[in-house]
Amino acid sequence: GLITSRLTDVPGSSRYVDQSVVVYSNEAKTQLLDVPAELVREHGAVSEPVGLAMAEGIKAKAHAGVGVGVTGIAGPTGGSPEKPVGTVVVAAVTDSERRVRTFRFFGERELVKFQASQAALDMVRRMLQV
């Protein structure tokens, strides 16, 4: 949501933004983006395989040139020793490239979300070299 909000703050963004999907629950990830439930069970919702599957899912559903998937723990609760609050996976895919990275952001929930959106936008910018 925040990524799309930031993209559509730019006049003329309808030329490059067609749609976005916010999938908060594991069920939404599987139902709307075709993320395999077994992938979520095996790796957890906040994992690089799930982030990539989300990016691939939205790209396929939207018939888009680029798909972006972000999954994470913004806090203040929900973290674990293995995946503390601030753990965010960002993935982006095109027809020719797949990128995924796990970040650890610090700060309040809103700051974690902003940093995640910044990381996603930067990843896409670097992929497209713009």
PLM feature spans:
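Short alpha-helical segments enriched in small residues
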Residues: 1-130
